Amino acid sequence: MRIVGINRLIIKLILLFILFPTCNNNEKSYSKIPIIWKEINWNKYDGIKILEGRNNTLPINAWVAIINNNDPTIDIDVIVSDDLDRKETLSQFSTNNKATVVVNGGYFLMNKNPTEHVGLLYVNNQTISPALKSLIRNNKRYFTARGALGFLDNGDVDIAWVTSRNDSLFYFPEPVENSPDNPVNSFDFTKSLLWDVDDAIHAGPVLMHNGEIRITINEEVFFGSSIPKIHPRTAAGYRKNGELVLLVIDGRQVNSRGVDLMELAIIMKDLDCIEAINLDGGGSSAMVVDGKLINRPSGTSSQREVMSAIAISLRN
């Protein structure tokens, strides 16, 4: 009886492997990721362009919103849920904030009710959640200034390594020099500068800096986590002309595997970004345009409730 039971278990495992091949994810990392982009036919607005893209090799499906931040009719904001549990879907964000384009924002604790943001959440010059200043990894405490995405009311975008002190935000021109087993045990604020933004959100790691790929996994203490691996992704960046680039890539699907951080950085560079940052990914990665979900988060048409988002709205 015991042998028969074991044989049945083996048969079930074989069937699962055959029926669900995505469980055996392609872990190869690609250095060239050509994507064929085409503009989506939707209710077009000046200053907002929505493209969908496909790469058949990895394979991946991707969507990108390109925002002209110099357009006076466009507002770019970090928004946060005011529901009792501090979470809502992107479609709800879109409706409640009258936003044309919405993508998910920073990390949050899904097991908390109400949920809590992981790191800085700064909206309309008010701190909703303080900057993450240190964390424990391998029984050691690391002080870190993680990557943050910031917006000014005039439309300017910035990406920097950010922390806070006495209710003020500070950025470091270079990341705090953490590495595995070599923690930095305090901040040297003499190396920092005041970060003057109106909205900001911690996420990370930074993917690009000064026009080059620079993924600060170790410095931001993402080593030893699942963040660098292949996942559905959301990323933000900006071009030399100031245009904001918001990217969403589906993953965990037969026809869209997702990407690792290096692949994500390559795609953002190919989109002409000079600075870029990884945002919350996995089942949270989604883009809503005119109130409609345009991607398939983790292969479904349902939306995960998230705490924060980036919203593109038209001024009345």
Residue ranges of model-derived segments:
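Short glycine-rich loop/turn motifs
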Residues: 60-64, 146, 202-204, 231-235, ...
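Short, conserved active-site entrance elements at the starts or edges of catalytic domains
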Residues: 180-187, 195-223
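Zymogen propeptides
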Residues: 25-167
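Conserved, well-ordered active-site substructure
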Residues: 112-137, 218-275, 284-316
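Flexible, D/E/H-enriched segments
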Residues: 28-52, 215, 292-316
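Bacterial Sec-dependent N-terminal signal peptides
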Residues: 1-31
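Structural recognition of the beta-strand scaffold that forms the well-ordered cores
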Residues: 100-104, 150, 158-159, 207, ...
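A short "linker-to-beta-strand initiation" element
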Residues: 162, 167-172, 203, 211-213
